[in-house]
Amino acid sequence: MKTKAIYPGTFDPVTYGHIDIVTRAADMFDHVLFAIANSARKNPMFTLDERITLAKEVTSHLDNVEVIGFCELMANFAKKQQANILIRGLRSVSDFEYEWQLANMNRHFMPELESVFLLPSQNLSFLSSSLIKDVALHDGDISSFLPEPIAQAMLKKLGK
């Protein structure tokens, strides 16, 4: 049986931490949907289309990864995609409590949806898109946190 997993998130922007998780998920599962949430309530820096385009660019080397946007309840999206595995990255213990709640809510709507938690590589465990945006906003060097095309797109958005 082929396995199909979803790695969902806002990914505003995709960081090396996200790439670490999706690359490892691609090694574990037959097909991985790198699912980018619209997340308009989070007021993202990049539009959904921009995030999809950038994610496709930096994951093009992963043959079994498909980048797709979505704007619906995760369980409904998973059913439509015929996926029963949800990949989530955990950076810290504080992430776990929220992810545990999400996993249980998803299971309420789709009992067969399994959440698989991956820890990022240790050198990437402190990264977050929000933190990187803040560093860039204050003229910090973001080149070690983001792939070059994404770093350039962010600097352009910030007028730098």
Curated annotation (Swiss-Prot):
Binding locations of substrate: T10, K42, M74, R88
GO BP field: coenzyme A biosynthetic process
Main localization category: cytoplasm
Cellular component, GO annotation: cytoplasm
Compartments it resides in: Cytoplasm
Coiled-coil segments: none
Site entry (Transition state stabilizer), positions: H18
Enzyme class: transferase
Alphabetically ordered keywords of this record: ATP-binding, Coenzyme A biosynthesis, Cytoplasm, Magnesium, Nucleotide-binding, Nucleotidyltransferase, Transferase
Enzyme Commission designation: 2.7.7.3
SUPFAM superfamilies: Nucleotidylyl transferase
Cofactor(s) it depends on: Mg(2+)
Molecular-function GO terms, alphabetical: ATP binding; pantetheine-phosphate adenylyltransferase activity
Positions of ATP binding: T10, F11, H18, G89, L90, R91, E99, L124, S125, F126, L127, S128, S129, S130
Pathway note: Cofactor biosynthesis; coenzyme A biosynthesis; CoA from (R)-pantothenate: step 4/5
Catalytic activity from the UniProt record: (R)-4'-phosphopantetheine + ATP + H(+) = 3'-dephospho-CoA + diphosphate
Function: Reversibly transfers an adenylyl group from ATP to 4'-phosphopantetheine, yielding dephospho-CoA (dPCoA) and pyrophosphate.
Family, similarity comment: Belongs to the bacterial CoaD family.
Record-linked PANTHER family: PHOSPHOPANTETHEINE ADENYLYLTRANSFERASE (PTHR21342:SF1)
Subunit structure: Homohexamer.
Protein name: Phosphopantetheine adenylyltransferase
